[in-house]
C-alpha cells in the first residue's frame, strides 16, 4: 500500500460522542492491556484495520474479528471511521495495524480503548506469514488453531509452487521485474527476479535500467498500479492482488496469483 498521510478529523470529532460509551464498557475492555506479553486464555475480540491484517488474525486462530476499512475502499487511508467502528475498538482486546497506517493509533486513542495495539508486518512471503501468524497466536492464546492452519497453508503453497514450476516456458525459470510489495509472488512461481521497482513511480532512469534486463514478466501491485510499467519492453504485465476478500482467507490470494502467473506463462 502507498505510504500516504491520513485525514483523521472524523475520528477526533466522533471521540466525544463515544466517550460515555467507552467509559461504560465492561471491565475486560479496561484491563485488556495488562499482561500484554503473556498468552491469553479464552478467545479474544480483535479489531483490524484491513482484510489483510484480518486474514493474519484469522489464520492465527482469532474468530471474533471486526474489519474497519471495507475491502471496497481501494486506499485505506481515505476511509473515515464511523461511530460503530470506534465503538468496536472500545470493546476490543487487540487492534491490529500496519506501520504505514498511522490512523490506527488515532482510532484507539479517540475511542478510549485499552486494547493492545499490535503492529503487523504485511507481507505474503510464506516465511513472514508463518512468523506473524505464530506471533499473533502467542498473543491470542490460539497456538493449536494456528498450527493447524499452517499445516494446510504449507501443503497448499507447496502444491502451487510445483504447479507453477511445471508451467515454466521451455522448462526454464522466467525472469521477472516485480513491484516491491509483490515479490512474494515471484517466489511462489520460482521465478528469477532481475529487478524491483516502487513503491514510488518508476523514473526514466529506472525504466531504462529495468527494460535492459529484458524480463519476460512484470509483476504489478494491483493496489498501487500506475499503468504499464515497462512499455515497449515486450514483457507481459501480471496484476497481483495482496489483499484477501471479506472471508479473510489468505489461501485464495495465492491461488489467484498462481492462476494469473500460469496464464502469463502461456498455461491455461
Q: Language-model segments: which ranges?
A:
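Extracytoplasmic "Venus flytrap"
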Residues: 31-33, 39-60, 68-80, 223, ...
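Structured C-terminal subdomain patch of bacterial secreted/periplasmic proteins
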Residues: 44-45, 128, 213-268
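Basic- and aromatic-lined ligand-binding clefts that recognize polyanionic substrates
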Residues: 46-48, 53-57, 145-198, 202-210
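Acidic/His-rich segments in extracytoplasmic proteins that coordinate ligands and/or metal ions
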Residues: 64-143, 227-235
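Extracytoplasmic substrate-binding proteins
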Residues: 109-176, 248-268
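Alpha-helical, coiled-coil/dimerization segments enriched in small aliphatic residues
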Residues: 61-82, 182-208, 239-250
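Short, low-complexity, disordered segments immediately C-terminal to signal peptides
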Residues: 7-16, 24-45
Amino acid at each position: 500500500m502507498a505510504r500516504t498521510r491520513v485525514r483523521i478529523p472524523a475520528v477526533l470529532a466522533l471521540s466525544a460522542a463515544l466517550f460515555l460509551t467507552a467509559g461504560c464498557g465492561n471491565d475486560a475492555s479496561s484491563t485488556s492491556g495488562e499482561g500484554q506479553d503473556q498468552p491469553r486464555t479464552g478467545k479474544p475480540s480483535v479489531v483490524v484495520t484491513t482484510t489483510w491484517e484480518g486474514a493474519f488474525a484469522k489464520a492465527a486462530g482469532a474468530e471474533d474479528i471486526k474489519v474497519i476499512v471495507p475491502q471496497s475502499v481501494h486506499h485505506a487511508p481515505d476511509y473515515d471511521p464511523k461511530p460503530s467502528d470506534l465503538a468496536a475498538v472500545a470493546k476490543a482486546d487487540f487492534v491490529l495495524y500496519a506501520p504505514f497506517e498511522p490512523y490506527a493509533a488515532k482510532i484507539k486513542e479517540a475511542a478510549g480503548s485499552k486494547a493492545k495495539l499490535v503492529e503487523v508486518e504485511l507481507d505474503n512471503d510464506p516465511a513472514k506469514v508463518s512468523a506473524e501468524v505464530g506471533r499473533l497466536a502467542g498473543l491470542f492464546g490460539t497456538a493449536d488453531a494456528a498450527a493447524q492452519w499452517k499445516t494446510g497453508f504449507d501443503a497448499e503453497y507447496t502444491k502451487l509452487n510445483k504447479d507453477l514450476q511445471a508451467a515454466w516456458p521451455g522448462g526454464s525459470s522466467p525472469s521477472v521485474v516485480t513491484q516491491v510489495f509483490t515479490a512474494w509472488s515471484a517466489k511462489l512461481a520460482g521465478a528469477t527476479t532481475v529487478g524491483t521497482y516502487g513503491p514510488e513511480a518508476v523514473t526514466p532512469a529506472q525504466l531504462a535500467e529495468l527494460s535492459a534486463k529484458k524480463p519476460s514478466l512484470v509483476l504489478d501491485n494491483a493496489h498501487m498500479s500506475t499503468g504499464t510499467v515497462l512499455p515497449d519492453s515486450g514483457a507481459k504485465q501480471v496484476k497481483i492482488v495482496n489483499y484477501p476478500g471479506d472471508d479473510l482467507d489468505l489461501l485464495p490470494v495465492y491461488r489467484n496469483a498462481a492462476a494469473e502467473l500460469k496464464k502469463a506463462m502461456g498455461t491455461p
